[in-house]
Amino acid sequence: MFLEVLFAAPLVIFIFRKLWAHLNRTYFILSLCKRIRTEDGSLLESKIYVAPSKTRFGNNFDLVNFTSESIFNFMRDASAKAKGRNYLWYFFHAPMYNIVRAEEAEEILQSSKLITKNMIYELLKPFLGEGLLISTDQKWHSRRKALTPAFHFKVLQSFLIIFKEECNKLVKVLHQSVNMELELNQVIPQFTLNNVCETALGVKLDDLSEGIRYRQSIHAIEEVMQQRLCNPFFYNIVYFFLFGDYRKQVNNLKIAHEFSSNIIEKRRSLFKSNQLGQEDEFGKKQRYAMLDTLLAAEADGQIDHQGICDEVNTFMFEGYDTTSTCLIFTLLMLALHEDVQKKCYEEIKYLPDDSDDISVFQFNELVYMECVIKESLRLFPSVPFIGRRCVEEGVVNGLIMPKNTQINIHLYEIMRDARHFSNPKMFQPDRFFPENTVNRHPFAFVPFSAGQRNCIGQKFAILEIKVLLAAVIRNFKILPVTLLDDLTFENGIVLRTKQNIKVKLVHRENK
């Protein structure tokens, strides 16, 4: 009997190894997921760079215990090693397809099937629910349709007045900081949050006692999201509950959600009593807010209370952080490039200074300033990565993607591709003059994403940014303090730097 087992053992081992090898061609067994294959049967490495891993379990342990700084560097290093090719990682339960080329990004972003966001966005669900950023299929289509009127030209004109008022308040604050180092990270986010709060909810955040707590809660929620982003094990809710800042997230979500929910209830009461647009208790006519569009949709049965909360929280989150990030980097680049700042001043100095005498059309004519904003977004996209998920097996870019494949589109790399932008690290606003964009790939510059899931509020954001830049440049010269070499970039929901970005303001003569 012993001899039979002894002689049979090699055969069993041989069969097991053959079976393992056969299965492992289709499945990455130790990573518990199906492999990506080529549609034409060619070697996978001929189509895509397969990134090496630290262990036999795929790339799962490559990201453990990273900081927001080190994970950003890891992503950039991985792209550098791929040498301009798209590349592949394998995580537990799912492969991740990383896209760094505009050509392949186009197919993804233009697809009518690949509209579901990837697992990273699941981390936002406790805050944003099923809002426009995260929702998919019919819910997304109906919500997008319902919200589109909130960004109509006439609505933007009414928002322009709010932007101007907040700019005037900010300029008064900035006058107190003249000839001193100014930390942009301390003043700009407050400006954008005030803007988005009044345009989304119809209330002035500075007038509310809860305003400070709300700002603090948003910041705390982002800190927890940052923690989860830096460790894939925290994506698991049980692991996060046991070892992460779960209670911190819950407590601050309660503050943020109660704030927006209370405002919604007050606005709903006015809506039902047909008092919107009438004078409030201070004798001021109440302005339109994005929330009014949602309340009208609720009255028509298109959305419920939770849906309204989700959309308001989504707009507050997206409109606050991304815009402030763009403004901070643009002001930094203006400080570092005096010639560009001078051209912007020449373009805006004849704009009417009175909000009653200015229109969206006049800001649309600030062509050079828009080129400056675009170049800033190209170098420093507010959202450096966007994601999709395959909800079913299908062919993408000539590759057979298994169900649940995660797709990561690296906007940071795509918009620094030397094939589309010569001297890609240089700040050159002229590259966005119409004559210089003729032969450029249409998906080489996509800071607001593209296709049907592009950012619904991009015109809102560009207008808000122009209004603030015009106000600052009209009143002050911006001088550099922080240099690009001083900065350490961090990866999060939005692009951040470890250091606060500082400039120095001096009054303009003969303003």
UniProtKB/Swiss-Prot annotation:
Does the record carry NAD as a key word? Answer: no
Name the residues that bind heme.
E318, C455
Entry-linked Gene3D superfamilies:
Cytochrome P450
Q: Which cofactor does it need?
A: heme
Q: Where in the cell is it found?
A: Endoplasmic reticulum membrane; Microsome membrane
The record ties this protein, via Pfam families, to:
p450
Enzyme class, one word?
oxidoreductase
Q: Which PROSITE patterns match?
A: CYTOCHROME_P450
Which InterPro entries would you find in this protein's record? Answer: Cyt_P450, Cyt_P450_CS, Cyt_P450_E_grp-I, Cyt_P450_sf, Cytochrome_P450_Monoox
How would you describe this protein's topology in the membrane?
A: Peripheral membrane protein
Q: Which UniProt keywords apply?
A: Endoplasmic reticulum, Heme, Iron, Membrane, Metal-binding, Microsome, Monooxygenase, Oxidoreductase
State which Enzyme Commission number(s) the record gives.
1.14.-.-
Gene Ontology terms, MF aspect: heme binding; iron ion binding; monooxygenase activity; oxidoreductase activity, acting on paired donors, with incorporation or reduction of molecular oxygen
Keyword flag Iron: yes
GO CC annotation terms, alphabetical: endoplasmic reticulum membrane
Give the UniProt family note. Answer: Belongs to the cytochrome P450 family.
Q: What does this protein do?
A: May be involved in the metabolism of insect hormones and in the breakdown of synthetic insecticides.
| Name of the protein in its database record | Probable cytochrome P450 4ac2
Species for this entry: Drosophila melanogaster (Fruit fly)
Classification of source organism: Eukaryota, Metazoa, Ecdysozoa, Arthropoda, Hexapoda
